[in-house]
UniProtKB/Swiss-Prot annotation:
Family (UniProt): Belongs to the MGR2 family.
Protein name as catalogued: Protein mgr2
Membrane topology: Multi-pass membrane protein
Cytoplasmic side: 1-15, 71-120
Function, as annotated: Required for cell viability in cells lacking mitochondrial DNA.
Gene Ontology cellular component list: cytoplasm; TIM23 mitochondrial import inner membrane translocase complex
Keyword Membrane: yes
Database matches in InterPro entries: Romo1/Mgr2 (IPR018450)
Top-rank lineage group of the source organism: Eukaryota
Length: 120
């Protein structure tokens, strides 16, 4: 029996929550350092620190939500198309190896003089 996978909206919410939590922590650290270093300013300590934390949480949450949806979207389709690309890359690698081997054979069979200029 196959388990239910989260929907796209669930992935979006999960990414936003994780990003917001990380952003709050980073905002607390950087905001605390900024307040200690440059002073709280006219708004006071808590408002300045809170603004750092909320701005950082909103930014991290936004990008993490988008990233979590993009990262987890249609994994079976990506794997199928990936096998197509892997096969194509293997074929092109084999073709380039054959071309290189033929060029090396031709170079060995007809050596050039040292003062002859190669034409491209």
């Amino acid at each position: 029996m196959q388990s239910m996978q989260p929907s796209t909206v669930d992935k979006l919410k999960m990414g936003a929550i994780m990003g917001s939590a990380a952003g709050l922590g980073i905002g607390f650290l950087f905001g605390g350092v900024a307040v200690l270093r440059y002073g709280p300013g006219p708004r006071g300590f808590l408002r300045t620190l809170g603004q750092y934390m909320l701005t950082s949480a909103a930014t991290f949450g936004f990008f993490m939500s988008i990233g979590s949806v993009i990262r987890n979207e249609d994994i079976p389709l990506i794997q199928q198309s990936g096998s197509h690309w892997n096969q194509r890359l293997l074929n092109e690698n084999a073709n380039s190896s054959r071309i290189f081997a033929l060029a090396m054979q031709q170079a060995k069979s007809s050596p050039r003089k040292s003062n002859e200029v190669a034409e491209c």
